[in-house]
Amino acid sequence: MDLLQILLAIAGLLAILLLQKQWRTKTSPGAKAGRKLPPEPAGAWPVIGHLHKLGGPNPIYRNLAEWSDKYGPVMTLKLGMQNAVVVSDREAIKECFTTNDKALADRPPSSIGLHLGFNYAAIGAAPYGPYWRDMRKLVLLEVLSSRRLEMLRNVRISEIGTSIKELYSNIIRSSGGSGPAKVVISHWIEQLTLNYILRTIAGRRFSDDSSKDAQYVKGVINDFMYFAGQFVVSDVIPIPLLRWLDPQGHLKGMKRVAKEVDTMCEAWIQEHVQRRMREKPGPGQEQDFIDVLLNNRDVMRKAQEEIDNHVGKERWVDETDLKHLVYLQAIVKEGLRLYPPGPLGAPHRAIEDCQVGGYFIPKGTQLLVNVWKLHRDPRVWSEPEKFMPERFLTRQAEVDVFGHHFELLPFGSGRRACPGITFAVQVMHLTVARLLQGFDMTTPSNLPVDMTEGPGVTMPKAHPVEVLMMPRLPSALYEP
């Protein structure tokens, strides 16, 4: 039974709730006071709302973008039995994260927060309040502060260096030492990301993913990311029987993954404690960029020329060089504009009544920011569908990705913005710079990369991208 059949069955069994829904609408604060609510697309059904119209081959953010063209940049959406507001233009989003930042700082309850967020203990899923404020302060001071990121600098440099050398060895082995070799770049990015995480939080890495431990850890992390991006029907149709039946099987999967993550992290903690007892203290989104560069070879060549001019070919680019690589920075910004990590961002919830774009937003309403639509607004971006890093060297030169410019919000804005922005940007810049400096890249038969999005919360590619890679630096730089 697919999702649409499940929704239709629920609608048929529970249509009687429509009367209750109508009564609630008539007695809601907005209705009683005659306040202006955001426009709502036609076609909402009892109980399931607009869910049946959000299915199909197109990603949800594309469907919502089409609706916003018709109904406006602030519109109401019925997510099952929950009311949501979707915003998609700079002015409305700025109002959300400035004037109404506190009013919209909450997170809606969800199965993801309950199970994968360990009963909302994770900072990203925690409701707004004293606990979240204390956790955010702890994370910013002890994990993501400038001092801590500087302490982790050697980890970043070491891991990207080791991973590049492993990539070089694989290319030489596959090509026999001459000519390019075919690489599925997403697999290398996944391995690099896994080792970044492991070295940062557990002080360990895997040289490849063939070992039993590596396969297990990678499987747990992949499962975690998969279920973190799944839609759970009972979240928006909160009927106990539906949660108990778990028709999609997602709740069972989330509970299993949560136990595996807990067991894995506990083992790492114990290993770390034992190591600290034995030792004395000592001093202490990249795939999209490559894919889009393969479709824009002139941009890739300009970035390589910039690196060659500022760094040369006798040493590897370092973090201290990045501030001089302005074209590379523009490439990263443009990649994040076209392919943000979360095209719909993380959901918010109103903890009090507020106004957005002249519309009344009642307490308890969910807020969705269509970042994908925002980043393609033709009123802000000339030729918005085109990959043009040069825009960030001219008209939009002052625009950054840190949540201060409301036309570019790949990591969110306001008090619930991603706290790891600085770390993420550092890693992306260094990874892209080293790949471009170290390798010439093209596609088999010089065909364009298929950028079609697959299902998921982070705009994954529908088809793995194969890249022909060839080293472009002296061989001594790749040696261990």
Swiss-Prot record:
GO MF term set: heme binding; iron ion binding; isomerase activity; monooxygenase activity; vinorine hydroxylase activity
Q: Which cofactor does it need?
A: heme
| GO cellular component term of the entry, any | membrane
Task: Describe tissue expression.
Answer: Mainly expressed in roots and, to a lesser extent, in leaves.
Q: Which domain of life is it from?
A: Eukaryota
Highest lineage ranks of the organism?
Eukaryota, Viridiplantae, Streptophyta, Embryophyta, Tracheophyta
Question: Could you tell me where this protein is found in the cell?
Answer: Membrane
Q: In which pathway does it act?
A: Alkaloid biosynthesis; ajmaline biosynthesis
Catalysis performed (reactions): vinorine + reduced [NADPH--hemoprotein reductase] + O2 = vomilenine + oxidized [NADPH--hemoprotein reductase] + H2O + H(+); vomilenine = perakine
- Alphabetical list of InterPro entries matching this protein: Cyt_P450, Cyt_P450_CS, Cyt_P450_E_grp-I, Cyt_P450_sf, Plant_Cytochrome_P450_Monoox
The protein's name is Vinorine hydroxylase
Any idea which positions bind heme?
C418
**UniProt KW Zinc-finger keyword:** no
- Can you tell me what the entry says about the temperature dependence of activity? Optimum temperature is 30 degrees Celsius.
Biotechnology applications of this protein? The strictosidine aglycone-producing AJM7-DeltaHYS yeast strain expressing pathway genes of the VOM module, RsGS, SBE (GsSBE, RsSBE1 or RsSBE2), RsPNAE, RsVS and RsVH, accumulates vomilenine. Additionnal expression of pathway genes of the AJM module, RsVR, RsDHVR, AAE (RsAAE1 or RsAAE2) and RsNNMT, leads to the production of ajmaline. Ajmaline is an anti-arrhythmic alkaloid commercially used as an efficient drug for the treatment of arrhythmic heart disorder.
